[in-house]
């Protein structure tokens, strides 16, 4: 451009800025005629200013800005076509097309589009609430089913426990304790009978063979804690201790081979043991002789009601002189009834004669003592 046309160019630039400002103000007041205003002004400017390259470019930029300003602005809230409520909003992110804008009514929770129909199905928060309620109902139904199953299982378990317990009339303790009683083989306290799971094992307390006529036989099953002691006190079923037997003086000589096996003579009745109490109280029924033999006196036919302890209390008694022991032994042999071996020894001492040394028939004597000819249980 020549220097002569600079002033014209400057003159064109200043009026163009003023025209653009005026066009913007007019577009804000009335958007409809704003599109035609720049064209007339630009045409007048072009006619007054003559030819130039810049004015057409400025005119095109003004037309684009006015078109951008010509877009429809946000309108006020529309009334809902269903409930006629103004609590509506324009959906910016849920529109399919700007030609048919979409709106949402917050009151009746319905969508509608301009120029379209109203949707009858509620969407949004309402559907979520419905889904939550349905899911809660679905979760509640399995819970109720599991509760019913647990009730049925508990009932079946209780029925099985009652059936395996053998009936509540026989032993109701099993039902209350859940059939977990580990002491089924022993009698229960309170007189309850044990279940008949062990019919082949008779009761030791109620047995008439071990203790005939005793208090435990009459009472049936007694206390379970004393069953072991009564078992030890029984006198007819088990092998007792070695019975001290009286032997002649000839067999006690040092030259005789069996003299060292002779039992010590029995002590007197009022003897004191190493434990500090008398051990002869168990044999007071048969007199001094029965007391001297201690627990083995019951084997010779002496009537007993409670039995004798089978503990080796004879070892705890102090030793007695041979003279006193001999008198006690002779008295013991005379006082015991039914002791055939003691009667036999007494007769041999009284006779003082016979075959063999000391007037005794040695084979017959030992056969009677060891072979069971006298009827004594060994």
Curated annotation (Swiss-Prot):
Q: Which InterPro entries match?
A: Dof (IPR045174), Znf_Dof (IPR003851)
Origin species, per record, is Oryza sativa subsp. japonica
Q: Where is the composition biased (Low complexity)?
A: 28-38, 133-148
Q: Which UniProt keywords apply?
A: DNA-binding, Metal-binding, Nucleus, Transcription, Transcription regulation, Zinc, Zinc-finger
Q: Which PROSITE patterns match?
A: ZF_DOF_1, ZF_DOF_2
GO CC terms in record: nucleus
The primary gene name is DOF1
Reply yes or no: does the keyword Heme apply: no
Amino acid composition bias (Basic and acidic residues), ranges on this chain: 66-77
Q: Where are the zinc fingers (Dof-type)?
A: 78-132
Q: Protein name, please?
A: Dof zinc finger protein 1
- Compositional bias ranges of the Gly residues kind: 45-63, 323-338, 350-361, 369-378
Q: Name one GO molecular function term.
A: DNA-binding transcription factor activity
Record's subcellular location: Nucleus
PANTHER family, per the entry: DOF ZINC FINGER PROTEIN DOF1.4-RELATED (PTHR31992), DOF ZINC FINGER PROTEIN DOF4.6 (PTHR31992:SF285)
Which residues are noted in the entry as Zn(2+)-binding? 80, 83, 105, 108
């Amino acid at each position: 451009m020549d220097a002569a046309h600079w002033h014209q160019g400057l003159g064109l630039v200043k009026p163009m800025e003023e025209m653009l400002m005026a066009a913007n103000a007019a577009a804000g007041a009335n958007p409809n005629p704003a599109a035609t205003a720049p064209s007339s002004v630009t045409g007048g400017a072009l006619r007054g200013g003559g030819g130039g390259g810049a004015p057409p470019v400025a005119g095109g930029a003004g037309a684009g800005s006015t078109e951008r300003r010509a877009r429809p602005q946000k309108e006020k809230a529309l009334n809902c076509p269903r409930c006629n409520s103004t609590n509506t909003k324009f959906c910016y992110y849920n529109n399919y097309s700007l030609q048919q804008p979409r709106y949402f009514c917050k009151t009746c929770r319905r969508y509608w589009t301009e120029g379209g129909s109203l949707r009858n199905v509620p969407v949004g928060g309402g559907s979520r609430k419905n889904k939550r309620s349905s899911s809660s109902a679905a979760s509640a139904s399995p819970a109720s089913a599991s509760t019913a199953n647990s009730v049925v299982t508990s009932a079946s378990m209780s029925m099985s426990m009652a059936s395996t317990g053998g009936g509540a009339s026989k032993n109701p303790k099993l039902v209350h304790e859940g059939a977990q009683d580990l002491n089924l083989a022993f009698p229960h306290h309170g007189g309850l009978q044990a279940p008949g799971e062990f019919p082949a094992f008779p009761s030791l307390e109620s047995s008439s063979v071990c203790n005939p006529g005793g208090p435990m036989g009459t009472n049936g099953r007694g206390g379970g804690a004393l069953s072991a002691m009564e078992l030890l006190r029984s006198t007819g079923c088990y092998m007792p201790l070695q019975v001290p037997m009286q032997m002649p003086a000839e067999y006690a000589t040092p030259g005789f081979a069996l003299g060292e096996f002779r039992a010590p003579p029995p002590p007197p009745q009022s003897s004191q043991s190493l434990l500090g109490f008398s051990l002869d109280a168990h044999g007071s029924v048969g007199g001094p002789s029965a007391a001297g033999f201690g627990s083995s006196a019951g084997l010779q036919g002496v009537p007993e009601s409670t039995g004798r302890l089978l503990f080796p209390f004879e070892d705890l008694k102090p030793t007695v002189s041979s003279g006193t022991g001999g008198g006690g032994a002779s008295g013991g042999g005379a006082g015991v009834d039914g002791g055939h071996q003691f009667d036999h020894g007494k007769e041999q001492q009284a006779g003082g004669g016979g075959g063999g040394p000391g007037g005794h028939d040695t084979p017959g004597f030992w056969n009677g003592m060891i072979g069971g000819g006298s009827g004594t249980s060994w």
